[in-house]
Structure formats: structure tokens, C-alpha cells
Amino acid sequence: MLQQFIGQSSSSLNNSINTAVILAAGRGERITGGEEYSSKPLIKLYNLSLIERSIKKLSDKLNVNKIYVITGFKHDKLKIHLDKLKKKLTVDLEIIFAKEWEKGNGASFLSVLNHIKQKQFYLLMVDHIFNDEFYSTISKSKINNTKCYLAISKSLSSMHDYNDATKIKITENKITNIGKSINEMDGFDAGFFVLHSETFNNIKNLSEKKFLSLSDVMQELIQEQKLYFIEVTGGSWLDIDTKKDFSNAKDFLLNF
């Protein structure tokens, strides 16, 4: 019913968006064990690195042809891998190093907004994986081409960690709160956004904070009543933060 509301209040299908941003700047210490030589985006699931899997899915399922990859930790190592993918894939990949990546993924995102030439784009984290059902829902959703959306699920699968999941609160058709410690919640952040660059014109000063998560950035949109949602199912997405999550991800991909 929530998803139906989105369709009724929107103006165009999602097939006009051809650009995506992948956040791949963090350390990923919980899954790498803090090993300094490890790079989370390069971790392989069934012979595909997390970053290559994200790129291929965006291209194959959403017809994305321009992808900005935001790097930070182990930038040089990741760049070597991405340069190889440039020769192998038909997608136009642009690698952007976020100088302030250690301040959080929110700071990394805000620092590269000026590089993104397209007004509306997808945003996702490299450690989130999605099945075909998820991408189908996104591609069929009707959206307003001037608004921002977050994919949310009203429930979680058994593979998710409830305590670690980011919760959201909804009032009518807008997200009114986001965070991991929300008591009265209506759903869960699936880690996939449809964003409009001009929406962030008034909040770029947030990057002056010592630490800034992506949820902090989205909280600013929420305060301005500018964050809407697209509903997906709880079993259509998974975030990979720990070694247990990595094991679950193998089962998740087998059950596509």
C-alpha cells in the first residue's frame, strides 16, 4: 500500500535515471578484522568483488551507464581493480577520492557532490547487495524527478541483525526520522537512495562536523521534509557488515 501511494503521487517512471554513486570509502573493520591490507569493496562473493557486483547489477538491472565510485581507505588498491573493470565493462566509471573519508560516509558523500553532473542519481553503499526483485521494484517505481527517496522495507528477513539495522519513521508519505535507536518505527533503511543534487545545496556545511554519517545527512533532508520512500520487501536486500553477514550473503545470492 505504501508503494502504491508513491506511484499515485509521482510524475514519471524511474527509467530516466542513468547515473549512480557507490560509496566505497570506509575501512569495513568488522568484516576485515581491522587488517590494514584488506579492502572491503574487493571482498569476493562467488568470484565477483562487492564493487564489481554493484556495478554490474546497476548496469544490467537499471540501465545505469555512468557510475561514480567514491573511494577512501586503500584508494590505490581499489583504483587498480577499478581500472581493470573500466577495460572489461561498458559502464563509464569515474573514481573520486574523498579526502575526508575518515570523517564518515556522510562526509565522503557531501565532498563529491560537486563532481556529479547529473541532477538525479542512485546512491548505494558497496556493502549492500540486492536481488532481482529489489531492482525490479526500483525500476518500476514512479518517482518525481525533483524529489529524494529511500528504499525501505517494513520487515527484516532472518538474515538481518535487528539491533544493527537503521530504523525509519513515516508520517503520511514522508520519512520523519531515521536512526538505529528509534523506538516507534515503521520500517528499515535498505541502503538504496534516489537523490537529487540540488536538494543538498543548503546542507553542504554539514561537512564541517568532526564525524558525519549518511544518516546524519538524510536527517537534514527529513527536517526539511524532503525525503520520501519506496517500499521493498525485507528479503530483497542485505547489508554485509560482519563475517556472519558475509556467510549469510552467500545463502542470499543462492536464493535469488
Regions found by a protein language model. Name each.
Residues 119-129:
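Short beta-strand-to-loop acidic/aromatic patch adjacent to the donor-nucleotide binding site
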